[in-house]
Amino acid sequence: MEFSSLYFLYLFLPLTLLVYFLVPGLRLKNIVLLAASLLFYAMGQPVYVLLLVGLSYANFAMARCIRPGKRNTLLLPVVVNLAVLGLFKYLDFFLGIFGITVADGGVMLAALRGITNGLNSIGFAFRSPTSALPLGLSFYAFQVISYVADVYRGKVKAERSFFNLLLYLSMFPKMMQGPIVRYEQVARQLMDRRTTPRAAFEGAQRFIIGLAKKVLLADYAGKVVASLSTGGAWLAALMFMFQIYFDFSGYSDMAIGLGRIFGFRYCENFDLPYISTSITEFWRRWHMSLGSFFRDYVYIPLGGNRRGKARQILNLLAVWALTGLWHGASWNFVLWGLYFFVLLSIEKQIAPKLETLPFIVRNLVTMFFVLIGWVLFMNTSLSGIGSAFAAMFGGGTSFAGSGVSLQLKNSLPLLLTCLIGSSVLPRWFGFLWSGLFGMGRSDRRGAVTVKKGIYLASVFLFLILLLWLCTVSLVGSTSSPSMYAQF
């Protein structure tokens, strides 16, 4: 079930919030939130709820056995979680490398269908799975690995309540596509939090803005991408660049907003990556929770930059190969990760020279290389990558004669909206607007109250307008699945 579906927006979420805020006490609220999270997951893939609960209990038990400083106690949970991720996500990929032909849908999907049929034969009524990859498994695996690693490091204590750990791992706002929230960030909030009217309003505001990013920008950009032929390779790459940003950052906004409504503060995941002036800066702003995971749990433990340049390069190679593979079991993702490894390695050598260039030049050069990276990302086959680059760099039909000029003209309003939406302008406008109304100072207390009232009313009306536009769009056609749901 997608956050951007009418079923979620007007049935599941309102009912969940109604029950959550009606029940007294944090313990009952946590029970409601856990039940809603498991139901949310079951609506997508019912049989995988058993895997979610079972794997969570295994990690609960293994974490209790971890002893700080004793690596063997950490090795088991890390291996178990990586093995589960590998079986579901990478088994068919590696079998293919060794020339082993797999059945249609893959080995794990066939096995899961057999298990489902067996359970149904003894009275269960599970729907046969259509995908071998449980929803959100990559995000789940990294969250639980960060948890057991932090227990080993002594940063957090092993959770004594399986209920609390399961709630942390399965909370539906962040379960499917992150952010990758660490246990230490929410451990205290599991047992001590409250939702104020202000927090609920801020959460709703963040959610609706994220919904608008997904429905009004990402989905329409995706339609342009799908409609273009190879003659429009440059326009397709540019629209995909905006599609994936608004799709994923929109989901992150919705997740963070929902968490805020329930009293949680999740980590940020995006910070205007398309205003970056270097590849290094881009990755500090893009999917920040994934970048910090690889930094803290892979790059630094491998030695980081403390053991000489040669070792640093090898550590970067490991990080970016894993980053590519995390996104998918396909060669294009491996190439995508290695591509950024090469760019970052070169950039480290020439960074002082680049800093002398004007901001706009550095930004345009950075975005050009990011755009090339998205071409690798969006084409799942090597032949597709080759065709795209051939069309972009001289091997395709001419721009004027391919009909793309008309598509560019038709897409120009959306393109400009995406360009503005991914810039710093909306943030500046928000600061200006709040300064004019919400943060205005006055000698009279009543005047300040009136200004704040006008500000809140204007924001409320703007959010209602966005929600209405999203609803109209969703009634006309269903929203496309979130792009990172497959990861």
Residue ranges of model-derived segments:
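Membrane-embedded transmembrane alpha-helical bundles that form the catalytic cores
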Residues: 1-486
